[in-house]
């Protein structure tokens, strides 16, 4: 399986694999309809880009044109092109806020419903920063979320999130693993640790691992994305297995 190889250096190190992040926000959702106008998508932002200096070529429209990422035919065509040009796996941003999801149709319908959905390796990244103008979210026992888009969590919520991933994605044969463990990254790892505290984050990650074991799932390989200088030295102690970047 792609990326399922020992993590070590030297002459026996596995060949490098290239995984591309995928933002699944290229379709309309009710929250954006209400915040902007019916049918709004971020293609409007792409079309609206203008040059800001000499040699700045804007707008940049994809060679295949705009598409709805819920369309499995359109998605399959683009995934095949990506694979043919050196992309070995896809890492989909999963938006989750205490049980609320947005833009899941791009992954569930567009990718997994396509002809390549059961063969192209893929993994998930917890996008614990909701897209603009899809907040606030209210649950009976919780306050309205801060519109700054940060996604608070706790141990029970993190276990529920990982359980959702396990039931829907980890169980698939083309899900990316590292040394036999399901790869999962957290977009704002610094906020996650700050929100729960070091002990709380460690407890949440440990509880999620125990839930996976109790329900017959593989363990996690949990990657912290761009932890800040304060969080980085704590990553291993908190329970992260690796550190990576989102934008270099």
Residues of each region from the PLM?
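Glycan-processing catalytic domains of CAZymes
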Residues: 1-248
């Amino acid at each position: 399986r792609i990326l399922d190889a020992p993590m070590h250096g030297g002459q026996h190190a596995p060949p490098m694999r290239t995984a591309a992040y995928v933002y699944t926000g290229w379709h309309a959702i009710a929250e954006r309809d209400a915040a902007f106008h019916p049918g709004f998508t971020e293609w409007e932002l792409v079309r609206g880009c203008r040059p800001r200096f000499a040699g700045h070529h804007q707008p940049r429209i994809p060679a295949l044109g705009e598409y709805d990422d819920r369309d499995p035919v359109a998605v399959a065509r683009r995934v095949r092109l990506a694979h043919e040009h050196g992309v070995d796996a896809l890492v989909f941003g999963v938006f989750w806020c205490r049980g609320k999801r947005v833009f899941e149709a791009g992954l569930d319908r567009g990718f997994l419903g396509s002809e390549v959905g059961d063969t192209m390796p893929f993994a998930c990244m917890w996008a614990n920063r909701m897209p603009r103008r899809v907040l606030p979210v209210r649950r009976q026992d919780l306050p309205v979320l801060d519109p700054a888009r940060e996604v608070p969590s706790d141990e029970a919520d993190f276990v529920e999130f990982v359980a959702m991933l396990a039931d829907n994605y980890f169980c698939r044969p083309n899900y990316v693993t590292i040394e036999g463990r399901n790869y999962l990254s957290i977009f704002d790892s610094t906020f996650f640790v700050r929100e729960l505290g070091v002990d709380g984050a460690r407890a949440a990650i440990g509880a999620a691992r125990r839930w996976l074991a109790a329900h017959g799932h593989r363990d996690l390989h949990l990657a912290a994305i761009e932890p800040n200088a304060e969080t980085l030295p704590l990553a291993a102690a908190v329970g992260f297995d690796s550190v990576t970047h989102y934008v270099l």
